[in-house]
Amino acid sequence: MKILGLVTEYNPFHNGHRYHLEQSKEITKATHTVAVMSGNFLQRGEPAMVHKWERAKMAVKSGVDLIIELPTSYACATAELFAYGAITLLHRLGSVDCLCFGSEIGNVSPLLQIAEVLSTPTSRFQEVLREHVNLGGTFPVARSMALLKYLEETKEYDVASLREISDALKSPNNILGIEYLKSLKKLNSPIVPYTISRKSADYHSKDITDSSIASATAIREHLLKENHLKGIASVVPKDTLDILAHSVGIGMAPIFATDFQQILLALLRRSTPENLKNIFDVEEGLENRIYHCAHQASTLNELYEAIKSKRYTRTRIQRILMHLLLNITKKDIFYFNDHGGPQYARILAFNDKGREILQSFKSTSSIPMVSNLKNYTPQNSAADRMLAIDIRATNLYTLAFTDEKRGGALMDYRTSPFYENSKD
């Protein structure tokens, strides 16, 4: 058995994801696949368009063997923490052999070079980084500029190599890949990394063309504007389309950030700058800007646009407001990191091969496998606190269901993992 690990959101599972799955299995020669997938809230500070069990079901029906949930506290975090949470989870399972992620560059070597520098920064690199941060831009841009300057100074790279590294630092999936590699190094993990080029659609593309591949962003944008599934039929597997149609039909999808608009504005207007200061990723006096803008804006979009700046991107603002909604504080994140990251592996969906993987994990995993919360007792305070955030996230997410009968709390206790029986 050779187990391939994937880090995913599947929002929703589309043809590009299926291509990534098939190519990853081919280049790694893996026999089994496990995907760590975000739950009901995602890394860009948005809710998933359909709940986590249905997205896991889409993936298993399209060939992923096992889906494990990335705890909410990491799923909604910065690229660095998102990657750390996901890689730590795969590492702690004990028998994952390799990792394959999509990237714009399609070559793991330059990403490994960058990860090496960022993982063990010299005093000179830190000095150059401070210089660029003080110029006032966003941290990712400052870090990219500092890295290029530092590498030029070392004179260890030719012009072509520097150009390749420069290009790598401009693309979101490359940056996320670098964070995966940093986490593997930090954990001294035996998991072997691979990458493949993303096929066709750009990560941020908002258009669905005649191609069979479209970005998840384009699919969500289409559903938000057109409010029908017909236009996405060519870019998602049939199972994804059927599951989406069912969820839409019973009032459980699609879910968008605007569904939480009134809740968020209410929370902000009853908060104080002192309260906001405790929310994770709020720093440098940003709480005052958020507080002021919340009393001027009447929609979420107005709020995002009012708060964002050259230093604080819209995506970062979206994440911060999601942390507020879910009450994820700085103390929470520091506490979880101090206790080694994810404390359990929650099973969302699996097939017969997934069952074989779970059997393997029984003897290798350093964290408990959780299939039914009714039968799970957190083994320590970190697990208890982490699980409380996961449950809170689902309880709030279900408030966006248009069928009020389905919006009750404790869905985490009432929903079992999906099992795909190959004999059916």
UniProtKB/Swiss-Prot annotation:
It comes from the Bacteria. It is found in: Cytoplasm. One of its GO terms (biological process) is tRNA modification. One of its GO terms (molecular function) is ligase activity, forming carbon-nitrogen bonds. Belongs to the TmcAL family. PANTHER family: TRNA(MET) CYTIDINE ACETATE LIGASE. Catalyzes the formation of N(4)-acetylcytidine (ac(4)C) at the wobble position of elongator tRNA(Met), using acetate and ATP as substrates. First activates an acetate ion to form acetyladenylate (Ac-AMP) and then transfers the acetyl group to tRNA to form ac(4)C34. This is tRNA(Met) cytidine acetate ligase.
